[in-house]
């Protein structure tokens, strides 16, 4: 699913509105993913605590959202723009690419909760397209 120029503008506008709360969104979305999809906890077994609000969850939630912010700036070529991140997840972290979609779903839920007026159907569609493209780009090195 490719992003149209209208989709890109919508993503940039929405990101501009919500980026101030990106850290909170990331922590909440990661907490939700770990609770709803407990199999994802295996990637974080080295953390002291997987509880919502734990320092590790907050820190990684922030890292995730910084990565998404980076993807927003690289929407024109996600595959090339996220190549280093794809290599990291494929070869070092060995994350099952299915988890990119699971996390995306949880981020969408949190965005909808935190920004009910801004997260319109058009914003939802555009951000979901970005997340689909991001998941494909991150899975590139798995092929």
Curated annotation (Swiss-Prot):
Q: Which Gene3D superfamilies match?
A: Globins (1.10.490.10)
Amino-acid positions noted as binding heme b in the UniProt annotation, renumbered to this chain: 89
Q: Name one GO cellular component term.
A: blood microparticle
Q: Give all cystine bridges in this chain.
A: none
Q: State the SUPFAM superfamilies in the record.
A: Globin-like (SSF46458)
Signal peptide positions on this chain? none
Q: Which residues bind O2?
A: 60
**One of the protein's GO biological processes:** hydrogen peroxide catabolic process
> In what tissue types does this protein appear?
Red blood cells.
GO molecular function, a single term = oxygen binding
* Keywords per UniProt: Acetylation, Heme, Iron, Metal-binding, Oxygen transport, Transport
Residues with the modification N-acetylserine, per the entry, are 2
Q: Which InterPro entries match?
A: Globin, Globin-like_sf, Globin/Proto, Hemoglobin_a-typ, Hemoglobin_oxygen_transport
Lineage top rank: taxon? Eukaryota
**Domain Globin: start-end pairs:** 2-143
Q: What does this protein do?
A: Involved in oxygen transport from gills to the various peripheral tissues.
- What miscellaneous comment appears in this entry? Hb 3 displays a Bohr effect, which is enhanced by organophosphates, and a Root effect, which is enhanced by ATP.
Q: How does it assemble?
A: Hb 1 is a heterotetramer of two alpha-1 and two beta-1 chains. Hb 3 is a heterotetramer of two alpha-1 and two beta-2 chains.
Q: What family does the entry list?
A: Belongs to the globin family.
The protein's name in its UniProt record = Hemoglobin subunit alpha-1
> Which organism's genome codes for this protein?
Gadus morhua (Atlantic cod)
Q: Which gene encodes it?
A: hba1
């Amino acid at each position: 699913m490719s992003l149209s120029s209208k989709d890109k503008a919508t993503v940039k506008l929405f990101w501009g509105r919500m980026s101030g709360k990106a850290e909170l969104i990331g922590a909440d979305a990661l907490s939700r993913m770990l609770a709803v999809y407990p199999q994802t906890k295996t990637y974080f077994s080295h953390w002291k605590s997987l509880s919502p609000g734990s320092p590790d969850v907050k820190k990684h939630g922030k890292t995730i959202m910084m990565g998404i912010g980076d993807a927003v700036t690289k929407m024109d070529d996600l595959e090339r723009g996220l190549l280093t991140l794809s290599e990291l997840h494929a070869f070092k972290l060995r994350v099952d690419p299915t988890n990119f979609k699971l996390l995306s779903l949880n981020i969408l839920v949190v965005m909808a909760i935190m920004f009910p007026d801004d997260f319109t159907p058009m914003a939802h569609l555009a951000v979901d397209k970005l997340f689909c493209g991001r998941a494909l780009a991150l899975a590139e090195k798995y092929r």
